[in-house]
Amino acid sequence: MNSLTVPIGLPIEIKKSGAPDTQGLILQEFKYPFVAKKYNLFEEEKRLVWPESPEWELELIDTLNWSLEKAIKEFRNEKVNQKQKEQNLDNYHMTDYKSHLHIKEFDIISRLVLDNFCPKEHNFRTEDCWGALYRKGHYIQTHHHWPSALSWTYYLKTSPNTEPFVFVGQEKEYPIYPEEGDLIIFPSVMNHRVSVSQTDDERIVIVGNIR
């Protein structure tokens, strides 16, 4: 398949009572030129257009990766921990879903992805961006990111021993074995998962949703 028509769930209106107006749910569609795409930011580094930022002058992927890993490992927030437990996501460490709004490194990586790898004909913006750290015993159940339009996962740290990123189709599964620096972009409607890690090697990723 060379292209895919992707439904986009737009924000719904809220009634005066505070309840969502589900009848007001609007769907748009856009033609995406591929089902999933993988890049490596180390290989793409020379052609990247970096966002202007007075707080970030070093246009080096290696430096950005180091800063992102540090930010993820140092992140602590009781509200995020509680939300993870409520969503049964407490088997790994993560930052909050809006990290791009208050952590400069997340803002930089989200803008790099949006400006360099996403379709220009749509007025997309980053809706969510967060970091996650997985160790032995950690996993991700099958899920999707709709109603976002596109989603992406960027691999800060991984090894040949970590579990693959798996797209789950109706009849078969499609594993991807990422390397450090790999960026996977895909329509948010695509189901995906990661099996239970059997290694002590860390897997550290940044995840983003675009709408």
Residue ranges and their predicted role:
Residues 3-122, 139:
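Non-heme Fe(II)/2-oxoglutarate
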Residues 102, 106, 145, 199:
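Aromatic-acidic/polar surface patches that form glycan- and anion
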Residues 122-196, 202-205:
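Catalytic core of non-heme Fe(II) oxygenases with the double-stranded beta-helix
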